[in-house]
Amino acid sequence: MLKEFKEFALKGNVLDLAIAVVMGAAFNKIISSLVENIIMPLIGKIFGSVDFAKEWSFWGIKYGLFIQSVIDFIIIAFALFIFVKIANTLMKKEEAEEEAVVEENVVLLTEIRDLLREKK
């Protein structure tokens, strides 16, 4: 049973997922800080208060906090979208380079095979 768990835990997909979760949590903190400390104060200045999230409420319903959470989500989702798009672009370039190397090797082997056939 320990061997099976070790095989499961050390599979590439599980390790990739664990790394992605940790990096996602760290990335979330960065983006949340960006939204909370830079973007929301700028938006607050536009609407006439420093932090509208705490001040915008009606009968105890703090819809300003909800609006801030929605903006936070949109910015985090967009940042992750850009990050994934860049990562996919880099991965495609690496795959294309690997395919080119394989094709070059195949061409050389084909030429060697043809030369050996001619000598016979």
From Swiss-Prot:
Homopentamer. HAMAP family: MscL. Changing residue 47 to E/K: Decreases the duration of the open state of the channel. Increases mechanosensitivity. GO terms for biological process: monoatomic ion transport. Coiled coil: none annotated. The extracellular loop between the two transmembrane domains modulates channel kinetics, and in particular the length of time the channel remains in the open conformation. Residues 1-14, 83-120 are cytoplasmic. It comes from Staphylococcus aureus (strain NCTC 8325 / PS 47). GO terms for cellular component: membrane; plasma membrane. The gene is mscL. Keywords: Cell membrane, Ion channel, Ion transport, Membrane, Transmembrane, Transmembrane helix, Transport. Residues 44-62 are extracellular. It is found in: Cell membrane. This is Large-conductance mechanosensitive channel. Belongs to the MscL family. Pfam families: MscL.
